Amino acid sequence: MAKAPVNNAARRVSKKVRKNIADGVAHVHASFNNTIITITDRQGNALSWASSGGQGFKGSRKSTPFAAQVAAEVAGRAAQEQGIKNLDVKIKGPGPGRESSVRALASLGIRIASISDVTPVPHNGCRPQKRRRI
């Protein structure tokens, strides 16, 4: 049975509401292949996010510090529009975009209250992958 056509005029696209949140948390996930920056409020609700790949960098250029800097600037500007002024930064992963993303957030005028490394370290859990031979 065919469904009745949906009237597009009946659908409403709500305008993005500007929240006024002063404090937040910047989660920087820096892997060897990409860097993802997510800015949340204190409860963990995402306000903005950006990644190196989402900014047009492809392949090995995604994993550069410059790509991480561009992604951090995009996420930071979107968070500033939501009212963010102070950030706690949590960095996870060993990638090359760790430091440059924090510098980019600071250069936007956002006050960095603390920087913490939350990279998960096993207490001798799972067996690691085989060693790379290049």
UniProtKB/Swiss-Prot annotation:
This one is known as Small ribosomal subunit protein uS11
The superkingdom listed in its UniProt entry is: Bacteria
Q: Check the record and name the Pfam families matching this protein.
A: Ribosomal_S11
Q: How does it assemble?
A: Part of the 30S ribosomal subunit. Interacts with proteins S7 and S18. Binds to IF-3.
| A GO CC term assigned to this protein in UniProt | ribonucleoprotein complex
HAMAP family hit by this protein: Ribosomal_uS11 (MF_01310)
- Spell out the InterPro entries in the cross-references: Ribosomal_uS11, Ribosomal_uS11_bac-type, Ribosomal_uS11_CS, Ribosomal_uS11_sf
Task: Sum up the protein's function in the record's words.
Answer: Located on the platform of the 30S subunit, it bridges several disparate RNA helices of the 16S rRNA. Forms part of the Shine-Dalgarno cleft in the 70S ribosome.
PANTHER family under this entry?
A: 40S RIBOSOMAL PROTEIN S14/30S RIBOSOMAL PROTEIN S11 (PTHR11759)
Q: Which organism is it from?
A: Leptothrix cholodnii (strain ATCC 51168 / LMG 8142 / SP-6) (Leptothrix discophora (strain SP-6))
Gene behind this chain?
A: rpsK
Q: Per its UniProt record, what Gene3D superfamilies does this chain match?
A: Ribosomal protein S11
In its UniProt record, a GO molecular function of this protein is: rRNA binding
- Enumerate the UniProt keywords alphabetically: Ribonucleoprotein, Ribosomal protein, RNA-binding, rRNA-binding
Question: In Gene Ontology terms, what is a biological process of this protein?
Answer: translation
Keyword Cell membrane tagged: no
Q: Write out the similarity annotation.
A: Belongs to the universal ribosomal protein uS11 family.
